[in-house]
């Protein structure tokens, strides 16, 4: 019994919730219908009769009660001339990767519709400002942007549409739009390039027999001073044209276009690309002044230069569209990369010369011959012998010193008898038995002392012999690399600037 009561209670609750939800939904629909605007031609006679006879609303109702927005003005007669002009609020920078640009504009269209002539009993100004909701009740040109990628209206806080109806039947519509337009770029001279971006306004359904777009005389595109991050755009560089197109099977369609000329500012790329890569190339030349046998310093310097330039090339390639032709910036980066790589190759050639046994032996022979020619050969050896017998003087002196100093001095008088000047510098409490006649400490168990240790000491390692050819390559590179790079700069900037 309890189970049945619980089930019935739950069923009642679910029915009540469903009914409340349906009522709320219907009320929302009702509210939407109340907000919906009906054109005078769609209103009933009773609704129209409620409007005061002398009011502006009544005049509009009289104009539109028999108005059919599906039929163009001058139907089966002369084509409708639509005068177009544009006011540019903002101009977004060109995106190289997607090849497009974004603008925010006021699009204004003006045409004459004889059916909308204000009656003679209308008392007021020559133009009647109408609520934007009435825009849908009128016939309007089917204008679209031929090179548009995306676009949107603005409706904050209300729909950004302005509608004027003039006494003679002229209609002026102004609307605010944000449009992304395609702009095919020619990046051959990038970043010293100048781009021409178009905005094409075309009729979608009406041929030239029914509709014609015409630029407003004088100044059809108003452009205030706009600062772009990478480009310069001037009002004098704006061009206007006619782009009427023929489509097979349908005919000719009216089209007008405006062309913006944008000149790129090179300052960003000078500071961000050209200056750093130039310094990296100059940095790679420092290896020419480093000793050829210092591979630990020269190799990392060359590798660092090449990797830095390669990284710069990769970074810029990711920011630019993948085009099949060579850009001006590509020429610069490739040249810098080649100069950096050439400095690394130059050191490889120097190393080959440095490690060539034949060249090393030839260099040793040349040095010996030069020393002999300078008098550092036989005469020097003769002067350094004892009485010319061939025994070196320092060896004879060492032998005599060892003979004289085999006995250990036992008193300071022994040191004085040998006339050594170091006696005064000896400490007072020194052990005479531990000093030889020279006043130097000796080992008790080794009578030879330090004289033998000096004889057994290894001679210092000989300095590496660097062939003249290796030095000559570095010498030539110091002048050749800067000269070639300077010559490349003269040619490069004379072509692309």
From Swiss-Prot:
<dbReference type="GO" id="GO:0045211">
    <property type="term" value="C:postsynaptic membrane"/>
</dbReference>
<dbReference type="GO" id="GO:0016934">
    <property type="term" value="F:extracellularly glycine-gated chloride channel activity"/>
</dbReference>
<dbReference type="InterPro" id="IPR008060">
    <property type="entry name" value="Glycine_rcpt_B"/>
</dbReference>
<dbReference type="GO" id="GO:0006811">
    <property type="term" value="P:monoatomic ion transport"/>
</dbReference>
<dbReference type="GO" id="GO:0007399">
    <property type="term" value="P:nervous system development"/>
</dbReference>
<keyword id="KW-0868">Chloride</keyword>
<feature type="disulfide bond">
    <location>
        <begin position="183"/>
        <end position="197"/>
    </location>
</feature>
<dbReference type="InterPro" id="IPR006202">
    <property type="entry name" value="Neur_chan_lig-bd"/>
</dbReference>
<dbReference type="GO" id="GO:0099572">
    <property type="term" value="C:postsynaptic specialization"/>
</dbReference>
<dbReference type="GO" id="GO:0004888">
    <property type="term" value="F:transmembrane signaling receptor activity"/>
</dbReference>
<dbReference type="InterPro" id="IPR047029">
    <property type="entry name" value="GlyR_beta_TM"/>
</dbReference>
<keyword id="KW-0407">Ion channel</keyword>
<keyword id="KW-0597">Phosphoprotein</keyword>
<keyword id="KW-0472">Membrane</keyword>
<dbReference type="GO" id="GO:1904315">
    <property type="term" value="F:transmitter-gated monoatomic ion channel activity involved in regulation of postsynaptic membrane potential"/>
</dbReference>
<dbReference type="InterPro" id="IPR038050">
    <property type="entry name" value="Neuro_actylchol_rec"/>
</dbReference>
<keyword id="KW-0628">Postsynaptic cell membrane</keyword>
<keyword id="KW-0812">Transmembrane</keyword>
<feature type="signal peptide">
    <location>
        <begin position="1"/>
        <end position="22"/>
    </location>
</feature>
<keyword id="KW-0813">Transport</keyword>
<keyword id="KW-0325">Glycoprotein</keyword>
<dbReference type="GO" id="GO:0016935">
    <property type="term" value="C:glycine-gated chloride channel complex"/>
</dbReference>
<feature type="disulfide bond">
    <location>
        <begin position="243"/>
        <end position="255"/>
    </location>
</feature>
<dbReference type="GO" id="GO:0098982">
    <property type="term" value="C:GABA-ergic synapse"/>
</dbReference>
<dbReference type="GO" id="GO:0098690">
    <property type="term" value="C:glycinergic synapse"/>
</dbReference>
<feature type="glycosylation site" description="N-linked (GlcNAc...) asparagine">
    <location>
        <position position="242"/>
    </location>
</feature>
<feature type="transmembrane region" description="Helical; Name=3">
    <location>
        <begin position="328"/>
        <end position="349"/>
    </location>
</feature>
<feature type="topological domain" description="Extracellular">
    <location>
        <begin position="316"/>
        <end position="327"/>
    </location>
</feature>
<dbReference type="InterPro" id="IPR018000">
    <property type="entry name" value="Neurotransmitter_ion_chnl_CS"/>
</dbReference>
<dbReference type="InterPro" id="IPR047031">
    <property type="entry name" value="GlyR_beta__ECD"/>
</dbReference>
<feature type="binding site">
    <location>
        <position position="108"/>
    </location>
    <ligand>
        <name>glycine 1</name>
    </ligand>
</feature>
<dbReference type="GO" id="GO:0060013">
    <property type="term" value="P:righting reflex"/>
</dbReference>
<dbReference type="GO" id="GO:0005737">
    <property type="term" value="C:cytoplasm"/>
</dbReference>
<comment type="function">
    <text>Subunit of heteromeric glycine-gated chloride channels. Plays an important role in the down-regulation of neuronal excitability. Contributes to the generation of inhibitory postsynaptic currents.</text>
</comment>
<dbReference type="GO" id="GO:0005886">
    <property type="term" value="C:plasma membrane"/>
</dbReference>
<dbReference type="InterPro" id="IPR006029">
    <property type="entry name" value="Neurotrans-gated_channel_TM"/>
</dbReference>
<feature type="binding site">
    <location>
        <position position="174"/>
    </location>
    <ligand>
        <name>glycine 1</name>
    </ligand>
</feature>
<dbReference type="GO" id="GO:0001964">
    <property type="term" value="P:startle response"/>
</dbReference>
<dbReference type="GO" id="GO:0007628">
    <property type="term" value="P:adult walking behavior"/>
</dbReference>
<protein>
    <recommendedName>
        <fullName>Glycine receptor subunit beta</fullName>
    </recommendedName>
</protein>
<keyword id="KW-0770">Synapse</keyword>
<keyword id="KW-1015">Disulfide bond</keyword>
């Amino acid at each position: 019994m309890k189970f049945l009561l619980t089930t019935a209670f739950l069923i009642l609750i679910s029915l009540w919730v469903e009914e409340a939800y349906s009522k709320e939904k219907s009320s929302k629909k009702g509210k939407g219908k109340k907000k919906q605007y009906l054109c005078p031609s769609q209103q009933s006679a009773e609704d129209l009769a409620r409007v005061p006879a002398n009011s502006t609303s009544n005049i509009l109702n009289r104009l539109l009660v028999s108005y059919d927005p599906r039929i163009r003005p001058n139907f089966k007669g002369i084509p409708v001339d639509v005068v177009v002009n544009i006011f540019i609020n903002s101009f977004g920078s060109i995106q190289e990767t997607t090849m497009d640009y974004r603008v925010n504009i006021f699009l204004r269209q003006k045409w004459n519709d004889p059916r909308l002539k204000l009656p003679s009993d209308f008392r007021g100004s020559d133009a009647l400002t109408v609520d934007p909701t009435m825009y849908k009740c009128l016939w309007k040109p089917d204008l679209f942007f031929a090179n548009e990628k995306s676009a949107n209206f603005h409706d904050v806080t209300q729909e950004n549409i302005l509608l004027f109806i003039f006494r003679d039947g002229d209609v002026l519509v102004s609307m605010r739009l944000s449009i992304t337009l395609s702009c095919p770029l020619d990046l051959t001279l990038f970043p010293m390039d100048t781009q021409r971006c178009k905005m094409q306004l075309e009729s979608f359904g009406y041929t030239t027999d029914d509709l014609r777009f015409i630029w407003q005389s004088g100044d059809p595109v108003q452009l205030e001073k706009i600062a772009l991050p990478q480009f310069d755009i001037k009002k004098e560089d704006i061009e206007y044209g006619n782009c009427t197109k023929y489509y097979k099977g349908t005919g000719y369609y009216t089209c007008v276009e405006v062309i913006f000329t944008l000149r790129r500012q090179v300052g960003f790329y000078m500071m961000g690309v050209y200056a750093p890569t130039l310094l990296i190339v100059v940095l790679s030349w420092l290896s020419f002044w480093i000793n050829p046998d210092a591979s630990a310093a020269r190799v990392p310097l060359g590798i660092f230069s090449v990797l830095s330039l390669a990284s710069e090339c990769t970074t810029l390639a990711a920011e630019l569209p993948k085009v099949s032709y060579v850009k001006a910036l590509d020429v610069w980066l490739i040249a810098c990369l080649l100069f950096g790589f050439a400095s690394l190759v130059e050191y490889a050639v120097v190393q080959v010369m440095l490690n060539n046994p034949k060249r090393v032996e030839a260099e040793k022979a040349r040095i010996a011959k030069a020393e002999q020619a300078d008098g550092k050969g036989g005469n020097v050896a003769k002067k350094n012998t004892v009485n010319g017998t061939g025994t070196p003087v320092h060896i004879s002196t060492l032998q005599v010193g060892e003979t004289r100093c085999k006995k250990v001095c036992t008193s300071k008088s022994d040191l004085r008898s040998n006339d050594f000047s170091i006696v005064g510098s000896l400490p007072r409490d020194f052990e005479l038995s531990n000093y030889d006649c020279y006043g130097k400490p000796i080992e008790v168990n080794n009578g030879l002392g330090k004289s033998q240790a000096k004889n057994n000491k290894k001679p210092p390692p000989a300095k590496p012999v660097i062939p003249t050819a290796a030095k000559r390559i570095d010498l030539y590179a110091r002048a050749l690399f800067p000269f070639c790079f300077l010559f490349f700069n003269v040619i490069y900037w004379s072509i692309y600037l």
